[in-house]
Amino acid sequence: GPNGAGKTTLISIVCGIVKPSSGKISVENFDIIKDYRETRSRIGLVPQELTLEQFETVFNNVSYSRGLYGKKPDPLYIEKVLKQLSLWDKKDLGLRQLSGGMKRRVLIAKALSHEPSILFLDEPTAGVDVELRKEMWKVVEDLRETGVTIILTTHYIEEAEAIADRVGVINQGELIIVEQKKELLKKMGNKTLTVELQEEIAKIPDELSKYNLTLGDNNTSLNYKYDLREKRTGITNLLQDIKDSGLKLRDLKTEQSNLEKIFVSLVKENNEV
């Protein structure tokens, strides 16, 4: 969702940080208000800000978080989490000695310290460079393999496209769609057929005007957009009409709409309602 859409507010409500003004939310059949301890123990939260005890060691930071949830000390589990996040060799270092990327890993370790089944990552790559962002994507992918359900908020479309199984779009405090990523691309994505020509043309022939074509780079290609949901895309007729118009084809290629185009379309439609 865009900035100010309500992503962090929604997460804060689910995690029990902000009290909802109305409605009901349950986590694994436990009400977040009536069963606060039960729901909170099932959730790990990695906030946007680096909230860490700078003068403590990595190991003590993570162990302390486990105790906050009433869990007994378990050095072996903490060791497992730190190794999983490539932090074990830094367990005795103070937080002030770590890079920004490693500090974010410590935040994830703290969120996993009490063995939650759901992990919220609130814009974990906001404000970081491209290299660190891709490093965090790898961490998320590795965590997913362990069976933890991960809910990640982001306004980087490429991030959702790279690592998400399901995508939800929130705008003006409303969750306007939740869909499997592949299904979302299939249902809402348009495709573009690019017809590459053997020779440059000055303009699109009048007999092709009904197809709403656009000229491509260097006036040597024609672009045709069509809806995947339609039974008839019109491609067969288009190619025949191109041939009849005297244009000579060199190549054909298609391009699928990406999540960014779908996201912009959804938000625009929602704002107009």
Predicted segments, located by residue:
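ABC transporter nucleotide-binding domain
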Residues: 137-227
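Conserved ABC ATPase signature
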Residues: 94-98
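Short, charged/small-residue-rich alpha-helical element at the C-terminal edge
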Residues: 192-266, 273
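Catalytic Walker B motif of ABC-type/P-loop ATPase nucleotide-binding domains
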Residues: 119-122
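Conserved ABC ATPase "signature" region
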Residues: 63, 67-90
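Conserved ABC transporter NBD signature motif
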Residues: 23-34, 39
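Conserved catalytic motifs of ABC-family nucleotide-binding domains
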Residues: 115
